[in-house]
């Protein structure tokens, strides 16, 4: 076995030859790969090796010897520790180009048709774009309760200062709740002992409606002086439409438990996306960046070229957002989603918007798709998929290939699984377009809309 050319805790000078999918710098020493957070292609840096594995190592920057013109001053005090915006040190326009290049690189490696990936659609204002904030409640070294964000790759809570991607109202509400916790000496959840009451404070905001939901995640069923907390929050923030107590007594990393108790309002808020109104409950999925989500959906719907004669399948439909966008143009839309609460919300959303040609089915996409096609003999003209990060399962791919819909639109939150799946469709479909959309500015995350037409 060849000797590894680097040692832990030793310093080296390297040139950054590329950036990875999460924005990390990549360097080589004697053909041995080193990943360096915060480094940019073209830079020369002095690094300290912090971890060595058999195939690669990790380094951290000690000094930047030659700086890239893509680098900018970081405007966030917790940037290095938080890890929420791992590309904040790079100028925004350059992050968009890097995301396009990352998707193009995957296309070139995986697909026979080396289609040219379109430039990433960025935001006009890439600040304060998130409509959902999840603040863990923890204890600092002095024993005081704090709220904030988890330090990168740990469960240490970094006290919240000013986050440039969250909605400012979310921070204000969470800080007010924290003051109440401190003043009333209410216990805070400890992962090691599995004791203590407050776990998380989650805020959801309707960007267009300004309605706010506050979710108090607790390891128990009662909050001391609960009525007083509700009064403080609702008087100070009149936009709060509902406050929900979420019961999570499990020893788990999952933030929300399954039981919700409304302690103010009716347990949901509404927001507008395009011309539609959507009902958002504590457990329902709703795009975190609705400004970009609207652009994403419009691209997908436009690409599908839906007509009044078309039957459409919307797989992994969530709360029915894109289903409703498509229903306007289609004869019938079938939305499929495994999360039952999301399907309840989807049905409610169809009712709110007077859409009567969309049917929503709760169940495993693989099984429901199989049933629609092979038992009910419903053959779609258009299939729209928006799967989780793991991509499409083989059974769903086989069923789509079996029915060969004329038009097929794949919305993806993971370019690696997108191109893996596209390779399986290439014999039958032509990949017409791949459009990256920047849903999470200054992070390594990129969504793509991919349009496929039957050959």
Residue ranges and their predicted role:
Residues 42, 166, 289:
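Short, conserved phosphate/pyrophosphate- and ester-handling motifs at nucleotide-, phospho-/glycolipid
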């Amino acid at each position: 076995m060849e000797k590894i050319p680097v040692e832990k805790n030793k310093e080296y000078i390297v040139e950054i030859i590329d950036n990875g999918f999460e924005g990390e710098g990549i360097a080589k020493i004697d053909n041995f790969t080193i990943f360096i957070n915060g480094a940019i292609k073209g830079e020369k840096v002095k690094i300290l090796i912090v971890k060595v594995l058999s195939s690669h190592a990790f380094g951290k920057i000690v000094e930047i010897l030659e700086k890239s013109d893509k680098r900018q001053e970081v405007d966030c005090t917790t940037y290095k520790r938080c890890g929420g915006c791992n590309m904040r040190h790079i100028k925004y326009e350059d992050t968009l180009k890097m995301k396009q290049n990352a998707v193009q690189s995957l296309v070139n490696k995986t697909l026979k048709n080396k289609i040219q990936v379109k430039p990433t659609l960025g935001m006009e204002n890439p600040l304060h774009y998130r409509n959902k904030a999840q603040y863990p409640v923890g204890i600092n070294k002095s024993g005081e309760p704090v709220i904030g964000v988890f330090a990168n790759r740990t469960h240490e809570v970094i006290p919240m200062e000013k986050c440039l991607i969250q909605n400012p109202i979310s921070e204000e509400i969470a800080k007010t709740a924290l003051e109440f916790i401190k003043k009333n000496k209410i216990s805070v959840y400890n992962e090691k002992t599995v004791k203590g009451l407050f776990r998380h404070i989650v805020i959801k905001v309707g960007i267009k409606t300004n309605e706010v939901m506050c979710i108090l995640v607790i390891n128990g069923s009662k909050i001391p002086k609960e009525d007083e907390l509700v009064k403080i929050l609702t008087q100070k923030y009149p936009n709060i439409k509902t406050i929900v107590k979420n019961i999570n007594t499990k020893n788990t990393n999952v933030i929300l438990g399954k039981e919700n108790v409304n302690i103010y309002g009716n347990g949901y808020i509404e927001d507008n996306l395009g011309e539609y109104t959507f009902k958002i409950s504590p457990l329902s999925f709703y795009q975190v960046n609705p400004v970009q989500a609207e652009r994403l959906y419009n691209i997908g719907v436009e690409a599908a070229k839906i007509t009044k004669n078309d039957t459409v399948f919307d797989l992994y439909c969530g709360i029915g957002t894109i289903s409703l966008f498509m229903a306007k143009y289609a004869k019938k839309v079938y939305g499929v989603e495994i999360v039952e609460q999301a399907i309840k919300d989807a049905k409610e959303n169809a009712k709110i918007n007077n859409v009567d040609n969309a049917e929503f089915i709760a169940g495993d996409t693989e099984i429901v798709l199989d049933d629609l096609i092979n038992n009910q003999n419903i053959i779609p003209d258009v299939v729209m998929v928006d799967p989780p990060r793991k991509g499409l399962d083989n059974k769903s791919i086989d069923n789509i290939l079996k029915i060969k819909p004329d038009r097929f639109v794949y919305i993806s939150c993971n370019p690696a699984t997108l191109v893996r799946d596209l390779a399986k469709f290439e014999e039958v479909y032509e990949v017409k377009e791949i459009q990256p959309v920047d849903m999470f500015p200054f992070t390594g995350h990129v969504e793509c809309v991919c349009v496929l037409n039957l050959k």
